Amino acid sequence: MEKYQKKIIDNTHFSDLLRLELLIKYGGTWIDASVLVTKYNEIFFKKDLFFFRTVNDTEIAGSNWFITSEKENPVLKTTRDLLYEYWRKEKYLCHYFIFHLLFNYAYNKYISDYLQMPNFSNIPVHYMQKQLTYRFNSTLFTYILNEASIHKLTNTIFIYKFYYLIK
């Protein structure tokens, strides 16, 4: 908490710790506020561990803006412990995706859990986000809704790009 109050840990990376603590203690699903769910699909909510997987990236296993887990999930506990150890020792953020890199290490440690998880790419869930700065196209919108029922709408990089466009 001290490093967060001193602004050494920013809001984004503090929320990584918060999401892990809540999921480890209570289980359930963490959904960032920037996510739109257009259709309920039980497979995303009723698993011991679920997150959208990253395609063609050996360093980042998947996204952390939507995670379902059981209580005391070992992958999340390992990720949390590694993050606390990192922040105990460090005064600066070495990589924006530190959560994802440590998450990748943790899931490799428990690879059998990862292999049992439903395989959903994080690419289709970003389609809508990429269209937000363009003129509305109903055909494309229908296509996107058919491709995914969960949509990640914003991220920090997108917000800065959008701000630049409207300036």
Feature locations, PLM:
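Glycosyltransferase-associated regions of secretory-pathway enzymes
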Residues: M1-D16, A33-K167
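Small-residue hinge/turn detector
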Residues: L17-G28
